[in-house]
Amino acid sequence: FIGLYFFNKGSQSKHKSSTEAIFSNDLEDIFKFLIQNGEEAIELARVDTLWRISGNDTLEVKSRSMDNLFDKVLKVNRGTIISENPEKYGKYSVDDSTGTHLAVIDSKGETVGYYVFGRSKSDYSRSYIRVGNDPNVYLADQNVTYMLSTRETYWGEKQKVEIPPLPSIPTDTSAVTN
């Protein structure tokens, strides 16, 4: 009976789910993001303190979209291993053609994080993730795939131009005759 208890306890500990943040490097050292989904891709690059959409000088990057990238996407936790079989990547939408790829690049031009996100078809509040060269597919603790759009208009908006108020025109009512 005691042997069965320890055997059962040992087999249960193998299936425990631990969570781990996907990105642990210094956020201040990130200078570029590359996001790709299928044939569509976008590059976001930091110039001094401002983020820019590479190849687009008419849109100003939305701070809310960048905040989501730093505060939500990079802070996603990977949990339970869903699959250890690369042949099942398509099932979890984390293969080359259906996954959303995110590369995080530092000031030296080195890739410090590479992730492939896939939507969960059964639980819309979560997503699947592959991390770097790790062949495992993990369940992420939240769904952030919608924050990884390749559309320029998701990341940027037309620059707001301040239009000065028109000078007031004095109205002289003394010239009005009844």
Can you say where each PLM-predicted feature lies in the sequence?
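Secondary-structure "cap/kink" motif recognition
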Residues: 1-178
